[in-house]
Amino acid sequence: MMKYFLVLCLVVLGVAAVQAAALEDEKFLNLAESLAMPEESRCKARRYGCTDKAECCSEKCAYPALTCAFNWSCEKVCA
């Protein structure tokens, strides 16, 4: 009975490891796609994850509703 429990634990851990690897691959693909875009489009595409204050406050990103306002309060940060 203990052998079955250990096998089940190994299977569950294996499935979790595969899912974690797939998630990392997805993040990498999203990053690669965003880097292939022109700078203005890339900035707008980061609306769900502004990388830093300089990007958030740059002129090309000066449209908080379209860019980084979801994670950064651009009006407050850039004031």
From Swiss-Prot:
Q: Where in the cell is it found?
A: Secreted
Q: Which GO terms describe its cellular component?
A: extracellular region
Q: Which GO terms describe its molecular function?
A: ion channel regulator activity; toxin activity
Cystine connections? C43-C57, C50-C61, C56-C78, C68-C74
User: Where is this chain glycosylated?
Assistant: N71
Stretch forming the signal peptide: 1-20
Q: Which UniProt keywords apply?
A: Disulfide bond, Glycoprotein, Ion channel impairing toxin, Knottin, Secreted, Signal, Toxin
Tissue expression: Expressed by the venom gland.
Family according to the record: Belongs to the neurotoxin 13 (insecticidal toxin ABC) family. ICK-21 subfamily.
Comment field on protein domains: The presence of a 'disulfide through disulfide knot' structurally defines this protein as a knottin.
This molecule's function is given as:
Ion channel inhibitor.
- What is the protein's name according to its record? Toxin ICK-20
Q: Which organism is it from?
A: Trittame loki (Brush-footed trapdoor spider)
**Upper lineage:** Eukaryota, Metazoa, Ecdysozoa, Arthropoda, Chelicerata
